[in-house]
Amino acid sequence: GLTLVTSPLWAPAQIPLSGFNGVLLLSVGVALYAMHMTLYGASAGQESWYLFASVSGFDAIWRIVAICAVGLVSAHLVGLEAATVSPVLLWLLMVLLLPEARRVFGSRADVSSGRLLYNYTLSMGSSTANAVLMMGLPLLLNASIDSNDSLQQVILAVLILAISITRSPIMIPLQAFQGVAVSAFLKQQNHPLRAFAKPAGALLGVGLVGAAAAYALGPWLFGLLYPPKPSEVEAYAQVVTSPVLALLVFASAFLALLVLSGSLVIALNMHRSYVAGWVLAAVVACVVAVSPLPLLTRTLLALYTGPVLGLLVHLGAMVW
């Protein structure tokens, strides 16, 4: 309801081409996403870690498949927006089709209503920080550049596309992998850093391999999939380079580590530390993103500094 009521304040600037359809889809998506997160949180509370991983993993897979399907059929803006929002129906299908999901979804809280409200508040804080770090940076970066500078606008558009592409190879498999990681972690929770080291090493290894591949093949592959228009050639020369693409891929490994460490901290019932890590990561990334540094420099710094500091908070919580 709040999204719908406040839409006149932000919709014209943020989704000028979508109009009422975009606002309606976003409002419905926000409402249904609350149920999605209820299943996600309850699965953690019930220690149903494979369901926990499935809720997040299939969310990402569904979104990619839906967007590709719409793109092949029509690529109409409303269709693409609906495809982006459609994973909020995943919780409903899981509850209807999976007995374990029904059991978890119907479980009752094991704390008082006051404590439950407090936990909800923490969850809202961490979800907000997560959303800012995952998807809010483009808005901040866009607000921080001169709207009359067409080159900066094009550079930002190419940079956002590059960030989206370089994140996917690590973040999507992580969604399916983290349930296994949490389950293995809990078996060794008396030695949390040792338990965290193996999956963390795997993620960093994937990040290094991906960065090397991006350095060697990234510019060629990017240009093949997204050939530049004449107005984009100069922007491509700055963004679509081997060092930049390699750094973007490796940055996604640190974001993945933050996501994984957050899941492990939640598994240990350290909710405040979980929120603190995500909030610190989001705040630092936002501050760096709007700093007076050159656009490309501050974007790369924001992608590294925020997740690394948030990760350190989570690791500190595991130890102390």
Feature-to-residue mapping (PLM):
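Membrane-interface junctions at transmembrane-helix termini in multi-pass inner-membrane proteins
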Residues: L32-S54, L186, F250-G277
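Interfacial/gating helices of multi-pass transporter permease domains
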Residues: L77, G114-S123, L141-R167, V239-S242
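Hydrophobic alpha-helical transmembrane segments
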Residues: F20-S27, A53-R102, L280-V284, L296-W320
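Helix-loop junctions and terminal segments of transmembrane helices
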Residues: G1, A162, T166-N190, A267
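Interhelical loop/hinge segments that connect adjacent transmembrane helices in multipass membrane
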Residues: Y50-V55, L77-V78, A83-T84, L93-M134, ...
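Membrane-water interface segments that mark the loop-to-transmembrane alpha-helix transition
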Residues: G1-P8, N21, A184-A211
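Residue-level signature of transmembrane alpha-helical cores of multipass secondary-active transporters
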Residues: L25-L26, V30, F52, S56, ...
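Short membrane-interface helical motifs at transmembrane helix boundaries
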Residues: L2-F20, V209-A235
